[in-house]
Amino acid sequence: MKIAAVMLSLAIGLSSSLAAAQTPPPAPSVTQDYEGAYYKRQLYVVTDMERALTLWRDLLGLQPGDITTSGPNSYSREVFNIPARAAMRFCTLSAGPNQARTLALLEVKGVRLPRKTGIRTTGAVINANGRLDAIIASARTMGLTVMGPRVLESATQGNGIEQGFLDWDGNVIVLYQFPNADAPSRR
């Protein structure tokens, strides 16, 4: 009898632990102040701005701002290790009004970019917003490298799909989609 009670107690404890692990943390109070850093955007270095825009603007639907020429003293040269002889252009893209300038493209011309082989160290994760199959089909048509899909489990949105691909410059893009899509985060 004691063994059965102990086993029942362990099973209840394990069940509670599993349920807790699958339960998202409570939403922070609206009045709680955030004192951390604010994420602004991700930047991809590309070799051809117009070609990159066929992916980001025409296929994924992001809205580009103006394309500007970066000068010789651009901070991008230092942080991205771009030689002075390279020409650079810059463009930010928005994902609707609530995600303004959430991605940047930096075109680098006049130097060869290194091939991205081995471990991929960064990637954009994007809600496909019900268009995952169409986007992946178009990525294949564009000749991009497409990885296989995977089931993506969520405690609150059901089972979804995630699928990644590489742009022409080897930059990683991972799409995901749930049956109960989440709204975009406000920026």
Please report, for each region that a protein language model flagged, where it lies by residue.
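Short, flexible, solvent-exposed loop/turn segments with mixed acidic/basic and small polar residues
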Residues: 4-5, 30-33, 113-115
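Bacterial N-terminal signal peptides
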Residues: 5-15
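Sec/Tat signal peptide C-region and signal peptidase I cleavage site
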Residues: 17-21
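Vicinal oxygen chelate
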Residues: 22-35, 38-48, 66-68, 91-139, 161-166, ...
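A short, acidic/glycine-rich surface segment
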Residues: 25-28, 73-78, 110-114, 184
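Core segments of cupin and vicinal oxygen chelate
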Residues: 34, 44-99, 182
